[in-house]
């Protein structure tokens, strides 16, 4: 004898299952599918309002732009992160490290944060201490990012066409760092070895060997740079290390062990390559940027005063020459007049 469930029975079973918690997949399969006609009871006003909600004609569906590299890998994301950091960071120091442990990195970052927090903030300037970071980078990917920033200009990419939701063609520019234009620009630029060696990348490329760490500053602040050098690469008397009495944690064995494995090899400041001496010069600017501006103003004023004195000296010398010539001519004429005057007196 076969059991057959009528439609009302099935509906009743479905409502019973909906009201209770479904604990198995077989019970879930017993729930009948809901008809789409149940959702067609919207009011005419809502339908009219929905008709006005339409996409603009120039809307391009969000699709992945064409790329020369796989975009879903960690290497691609690191490349885009490094290129963005290179374009937005005006001051960057490059270090080579030798197998520092996590505890040593933590100790070094602790002392670095302490030294940076003691730097006085100029009046009216933001505090950049919390935005100064010391991080380890992937050397090979960072090298590619540096080449991309150096040899690829996104503004030179000509726009192409993209299909909108309505099927029309609109101009679109694919100039991201993973695009084929970036790959071709880097490939063409690196063919000429002699030209590459004269660029900033050619000067920094020999430093990107082995494990690399970078210190990034969001602005060119000689005061913060000097504080960082006193911790990471001290060189007295310009950048002496903190005293043991003032900062005993700096002389902790873990911190000192990590600092011995850290070597400053160069830097990139305002898009230019700097060696160790150049970095020390920037960090030694007195009173920071304001002091540099004062030196520049003084130099310009001195040059202007020198030019004014030179021009005035030429005019004065010409005037003295003319005056001396006039006096000579007067003396040549005055003796005759004096002789005539004496004769008149004798008469």
From Swiss-Prot:
Keywords of the record: Mitochondrion
Keyword Mitochondrion attributed: yes
Protein's cellular compartments: Mitochondrion
Gene Ontology CC, one term: mitochondrial large ribosomal subunit
Annotated spans, Disordered: 55-74, 325-347
Protein's job: Component of the mitochondrial ribosome (mitoribosome), a dedicated translation machinery responsible for the synthesis of mitochondrial genome-encoded proteins, including at least some of the essential transmembrane subunits of the mitochondrial respiratory chain. The mitoribosomes are attached to the mitochondrial inner membrane and translation products are cotranslationally integrated into the membrane.
Subunit structure: Component of the mitochondrial large ribosomal subunit (mt-LSU). Mature N.crassa 74S mitochondrial ribosomes consist of a small (37S) and a large (54S) subunit. The 37S small subunit contains a 16S ribosomal RNA (16S mt-rRNA) and 32 different proteins. The 54S large subunit contains a 23S rRNA (23S mt-rRNA) and 42 different proteins.
Similarity annotation: Belongs to the universal ribosomal protein uL10 family.
Record protein name field: Large ribosomal subunit protein uL10m
Lineage: Eukaryota, Fungi, Dikarya, Ascomycota, Pezizomycotina
């Amino acid at each position: 004898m076969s059991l057959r469930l009528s439609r009302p029975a099935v509906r009743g079973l479905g409502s019973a299952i909906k009201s209770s918690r479904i604990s198995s997949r077989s019970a879930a399969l017993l729930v009948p599918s809901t008809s789409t006609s149940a959702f067609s009871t919207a009011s005419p006003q809502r339908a009219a309002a929905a008709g006005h909600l339409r996409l603009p004609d120039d809307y391009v569906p969000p699709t992945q732009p064409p790329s020369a590299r796989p975009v879903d890998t960690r290497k691609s994301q690191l490349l885009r992160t490094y290129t963005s950091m290179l374009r937005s960071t005006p001051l960057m120091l490059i270090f080579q490290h030798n197998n520092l442990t996590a505890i040593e990195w933590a100790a070094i970052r602790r002392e670095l944060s302490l030294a940076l927090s003691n730097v006085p903030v100029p009046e009216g300037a933001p505090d950049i201490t919390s935005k100064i970071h010391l991080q380890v980078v992937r050397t090979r990917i960072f090298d590619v990012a540096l080449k991309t920033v150096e040899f690829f200009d996104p503004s030179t990419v000509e726009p192409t066409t993209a299909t909108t939701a309505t099927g029309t063609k609109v101009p679109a520019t694919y100039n991201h760092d993973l695009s084929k234009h970036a790959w071709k620009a880097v490939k063409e630029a690196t063919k000429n070895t002699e030209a590459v060696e004269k660029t900033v990348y050619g000067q920094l490329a020999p430093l990107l060997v082995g494990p690399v760490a970078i210190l990034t500053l969001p602005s060119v602040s000689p005061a913060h740079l000097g504080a960082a050098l006193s911790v990471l690469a001290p060189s007295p008397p310009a950048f002496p290390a903190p005293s043991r009495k003032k900062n005993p944690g700096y002389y902790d064995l873990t911190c000192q062990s990590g600092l011995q494995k850290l070597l400053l090899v160069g830097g990139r400041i305002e898009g230019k390559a700097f060696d160790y001496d150049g970095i020390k010069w920037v960090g030694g600017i007195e009173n920071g940027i304001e002091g540099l501006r004062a030196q520049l103003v003084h130099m310009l004023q001195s040059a202007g005063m020198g030019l004014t004195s030179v021009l005035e000296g030429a005019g004065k010398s010409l005037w003295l020459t003319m005056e001396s010539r006039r006096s000579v001519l007067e003396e040549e004429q005055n003796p005759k007049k004096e002789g005539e005057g004496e004769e008149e007196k004798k008469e």
